[in-house]
Design a protein with these regions (language model features):
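Zinc-dependent deaminase
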Residues: 2-65, 125, 132-192
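Short beta-strand scaffold segments in enzyme catalytic cores
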Residues: 70-74
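A short, polar/charged loop-to-alpha-helix boundary motif
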Residues: 89-100
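Immediate flanking context of iron-sulfur cluster ligation sites
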Residues: 111-123
Length: 192
């Protein structure tokens, strides 16, 4: 393992990514944060404590981002992918935390790993990310700060995830908002 190389996925030395020496888009997104999918026939319904536990992981991803947004994909109680906002690091306006987590998952698993899974994100998804979430057929979305809260600190497309989901009857999804919202908002500078 090469320890001092700069990682493609985070831009940081020694992130632990086993693909640090490869220079390709797929390698950059296939970070070791992606864990094997453990399929079980009957998963227990997540509790509020579960939601907070996984949101704390998403918040940690956000703290490590150049722009404080993080996401975690969970299937059957196991984290299968993580993502943080890399749009500034990669000069890619589509590299939102949710999109990075989805791409990392798909670099290792087929799309069936996403169907029915839960996506935890520190900010209510924008229209682009929510569209991807719906097309991936996630079963559940849990976010911290709402679009309205985020709009007090940065530009937002003022459409809620629930409104977008209501227009996608092909992709039913459960949406829970406000989980550790104060912690997510604390990552942003105060409003001017």
């Amino acid at each position: 393992m090469m320890m001092a190389e700069i990682c493609d996925c985070t831009g940081e030395p020694e992130c632990g990514c086993r693909f640090a020496s490869r220079r390709s888009v797929v390698a950059a997104l296939a970070c070791t944060a992606v864990l094997p999918v453990m399929l079980r026939s009957a998963a227990a319904a997540p509790t509020a404590a579960d939601d907070e536990r996984f949101m704390r992981i998403a918040l940690e991803e956000a703290r490590q981002a150049g722009f404080p947004f993080g996401a975690v994909i969970v299937r059957d109680g196991q984290v299968i992918a993580r993502g943080r906002n890399l749009n500034r690091a990669k000069d890619d306006p589509t590299a939102h935390g949710e999109m990075v987590a989805i791409r990392r998952c798909l670099a290792v698993h087929d799309r069936t790993a996403l169907a029915g899974a839960t996506l935890y994100t520190t900010g209510e998804p924008c229209a682009m990310c929510m569209g991807a979430i719906l097309w991936c057929h996630f079963g559940r979305l849990v976010f911290a700060a709402s679009v309205e809260q985020l709009a007090t600190r940065l530009d937002q497309i003022m459409i809620s995830s629930a409104e977008l989901a209501s227009r996608a009857s092909f992709a039913p999804i459960s949406i829970t908002g406000g989980v550790l919202a104060e912690a997510a908002m604390a990552l942003f500078p105060p409003p001017k």
